[in-house]
């Protein structure tokens, strides 16, 4: 179970809608992923599509909870305004907060992010904060009262995987709120590693929506997240510099004994 604030989800995979080539394909991918929570960027959402059904109506039909986000915002003020508009339009106080430093790297502006999160928490929002892989920033976000910390594995859309696994593991070991890896996942093994490092969940969009076969990739991500979660619970063996035999050498017949 993934527990965030006052909600519980069976799936540890959160899927984003960005980059999908069609709503029909997006729907197939959402179902294949098993996700129960999905993000929608308010700034680029279209109320309806050529099919006539809005993405919000589709999510309600699929019984998938909606997580509006503030993608594209560059200041705390813009992020707060976007969150407030989303709450008014969608009747939800949940929001994924993104405040981007520039359009080239899409890395978080952590100063503006902290300001936005503090204001939104004070305004009654349940805040999930997209942030860098810096453990200090993660701790400060937790101090602000966010419901979940969402460090990046690598820059958005790069598919580079987890560039700093030590920091992700450190954030997980210190956090008392859920840690959800967000951004940079390229394939299933990246999602598995995130869970093995101690993350409570994985959020991804491009890895599925821009894959050659999005539905197949969505299914692989479903299994990858579960595999990583089970591996983390099972506990890996210690890493060693030298070989350790799995079977004892005692009782082995030797050539010398046969000759004698």
UniProtKB/Swiss-Prot annotation:
GO terms for molecular function: thiazole synthase activity. GO terms for biological process: thiamine diphosphate biosynthetic process. Its EC number is 2.8.1.10. It is an enzyme of class 2 (transferase). Signal peptide: none annotated. It catalyses: [ThiS sulfur-carrier protein]-C-terminal-Gly-aminoethanethioate + 2-iminoacetate + 1-deoxy-D-xylulose 5-phosphate = [ThiS sulfur-carrier protein]-C-terminal Gly-Gly + 2-[(2R,5Z)-2-carboxy-4-methylthiazol-5(2H)-ylidene]ethyl phosphate + 2 H2O + H(+). Its main location: cytoplasm. Keywords: Cytoplasm, Schiff base, Thiamine biosynthesis, Transferase. The active site is at residue 96. It is found in: Cytoplasm. GO terms for cellular component: cytoplasm. Pathway: Cofactor biosynthesis; thiamine diphosphate biosynthesis. 1-deoxy-D-xylulose 5-phosphate binds at residues 157, 183-184, 205-206. Catalyzes the rearrangement of 1-deoxy-D-xylulose 5-phosphate (DXP) to produce the thiazole phosphate moiety of thiamine. Sulfur is provided by the thiocarboxylate moiety of the carrier protein ThiS. In vitro, sulfur can be provided by H(2)S. Belongs to the ThiG family. Homotetramer. Forms heterodimers with either ThiH or ThiS. HAMAP family: ThiG. This is Thiazole synthase. It comes from Corynebacterium glutamicum (strain ATCC 13032 / DSM 20300 / JCM 1318 / BCRC 11384 / CCUG 27702 / LMG 3730 / NBRC 12168 / NCIMB 10025 / NRRL B-2784 / 534). The lineage of its organism: Bacteria, Bacillati, Actinomycetota, Actinomycetes, Mycobacteriales. The gene is thiG.
């Amino acid at each position: 179970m993934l527990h965030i604030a006052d909600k519980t989800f069976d799936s540890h995979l959160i899927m984003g809608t960005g980059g999908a080539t069609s709503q029909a394909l997006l729907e197939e991918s959402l179902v294949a992923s098993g996700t129960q929570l999905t993000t929608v960027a308010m700034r680029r959402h279209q109320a309806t599509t050529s099919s006539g059904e809005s993405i919000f109506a589709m999510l309600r039909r699929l019984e998938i909870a909606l997580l509006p986000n503030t993608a594209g915002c560059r200041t705390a003020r813009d992020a707060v305004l976007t969150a407030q508009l989303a709450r008014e339009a969608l009747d939800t106080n949940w929001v994924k907060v993104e405040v981007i430093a520039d359009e080239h790297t899409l890395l978080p502006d952590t100063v503006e992010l902290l300001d936005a999160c503090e204001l939104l928490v004070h305004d009654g929002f349940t805040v999930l904060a997209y942030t860098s892989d810096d453990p200090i920033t993660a701790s400060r976000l937790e101090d602000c009262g966010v419901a979940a910390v969402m460090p990046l594995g690598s820059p958005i859309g790069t598919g580079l995987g987890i560039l700093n696994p030590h920091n992700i593991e450190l954030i997980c070991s210190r956090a008392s709120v859920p840690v959800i890896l967000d951004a940079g996942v390229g394939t299933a093994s990246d999602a598995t590693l995130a869970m093995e490092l101690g993350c409570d969940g994985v959020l991804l969009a491009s890895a599925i929506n821009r894959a050659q076969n999005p539905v197949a990739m969505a299914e692989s991500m479903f299994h990858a997240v579960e595999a990583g979660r089970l591996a983390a619970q099972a506990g890996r063996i210690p890493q060693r510099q030298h070989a350790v035999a799995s079977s004892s050498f005692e009782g082995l017949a030797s050539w010398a004994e046969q000759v004698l």
